[in-house]
């Protein structure tokens, strides 16, 4: 949710909302233009989540975000320079290469995809909804150091342990 210019909620969602705001997209406006009518919640096994929306003009569209490799497995199309094209191995390799470049810069990368629907899904399960997607882009986020990390490192050093790398 966005209140007085501040995103409130899960850190990943806040980062995406803040980025969209920087691109000139207002969540408060979009929430009325794209009313959420259903979702397939995030699942760590699928590494993605999907929301389904009804537009002001009555169209139904789904948006899916998640791990790039998992999203790409479900994409049959890609949006390139505003044009929807069939997904092929060259496009897939280019996307995965850019994903690697971003990950090599210590960014946490999410892929975004969409699909226009003829009607609201009968069931909101991943097999029925998360298929035939159109890849629309990647976004990389910096994962800030958690507040408990510095004290944990100090505690390790005090105990004679030399931390080398902390992940996850």
Q: Model segments located where?
A:
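Cytosolic catalytic regions of ATP/NTP-dependent phosphoryl-transfer enzymes
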Residues: 1-135, 141, 151-155, 159-168
